[in-house]
């Protein structure tokens, strides 16, 4: 069976306060806005992956819970991201932590409107090849 010819991924997250969510994505995480649809704003997280912030009243889904998704951002600058989040006043549910068994740095925090976010950096050489292919 042939693989789908997938070129990217967008995760859409639904918000009651779209401007506050957009401020978080742009000014806290530092993500560039690549598509403004008015009620949906799409931010680039890597060359072919994106996060979309959607006005809950206009989106295609009737998102009723915020604890059904964990948005995990794979970074190559974990310590810098930690400091950026600290400077923005975020508290961490978990971490920052180094997992000896997984060979990752990880931290979790609650973002806008109660959504859970994880920031992680893979440290094992084999996993770095998988998750950081553009750094070769």
What are these regions, as identified by a protein language model?
Residues 1-22, 69-73, 123-136:
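N-terminal beta-strand motif that seeds the catalytic metal site of vicinal oxygen chelate
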Residues 31-66, 109, 116-122:
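Conserved short beta-strand elements that form part of the metal-binding/catalytic scaffold
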Residues 7, 65-67, 101:
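Residue-level preference for beta-strand/loop junctions
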Residues 30-36, 91-96:
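Short secondary-structure junctions
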Residues 1-4, 86-136:
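Vicinal oxygen chelate
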Residues 20-21, 78-82:
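Short, conserved charged micro-motifs
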Residues 21-26, 85, 114:
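Conserved active-site tyrosine of GNAT-family acetyltransferases
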């Amino acid at each position: 069976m042939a693989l789908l010819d997938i070129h990217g991924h967008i995760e859409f997250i639904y918000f009651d306060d779209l401007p506050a969510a957009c401020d978080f994505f742009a000014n806290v995480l530092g993500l560039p806005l690549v598509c403004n649809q008015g009620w949906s704003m799409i931010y680039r997280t890597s060359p072919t992956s994106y996060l979309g912030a959607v006005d809950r009243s206009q989106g295609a889904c009737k998102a009723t819970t915020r604890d059904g998704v964990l948005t995990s951002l794979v970074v190559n600058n974990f310590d810098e991201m930690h400091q950026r989040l600290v400077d923005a006043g975020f508290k961490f549910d978990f971490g920052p932590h180094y997992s000896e068994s997984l060979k990752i740095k990880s931290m979790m925090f609650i973002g806008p409107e109660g959504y859970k976010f994880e920031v992680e950096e893979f440290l094992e050489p084999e996993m770095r090849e998988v998750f950081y292919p553009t750094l070769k």
